């Protein structure tokens, strides 16, 4: 009986390292910003709340915003073929993203650093490589809803809100993040059959 373990398939490449460094730099940016914007007498709890929500906003704007940018502005022309719909299309046959039947949109067709980041992510879930309408609709909500709300929470911390608005909006945002993540997870299970 052979008990030899198979070699690991974990690959740490340049894209992975740059992606992790990008996320770490956003966290460091949030921390340094807290040092400048919060009074030195701010409690540790409020400083952590500020850092967390600023980090959340930066993730929404920088990383998820780059996903939306790639979905709307990065594309490849579909060669004329008899394959209909095109095998790489993430939309129904009669649905053409942005009205172009001859284009496929998404990071899968880009060469920028952010496109490479999303190409890596798409290896685990192909919806993130193209223009999946459900993912785009969720990301529009996070970039234009959750991101600004996270900044508003940071502003309430900075002002020293005593009226309870801080905790109300922090609870609203946390609930939205939890439900959004769960919805996306369930949708992925429904489409792939994997849990």
Descriptions of predicted regions:
Residues 175-195:
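Juxtamembrane loop segments immediately following a transmembrane helix
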Residues 10-24, 44-63, 135-140, 164-173, ...:
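Transmembrane alpha-helices of multi-pass eukaryotic membrane proteins
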Residues 1-42:
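Sequence termini and other peripheral, non-core segments
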Residues 127-161:
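Internal catalytic-core helix/loop-beta-alpha segment
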Residues 1-15, 90, 94, 117-136, ...:
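Juxtamembrane membrane-interface segments at transmembrane-helix boundaries in membrane proteins
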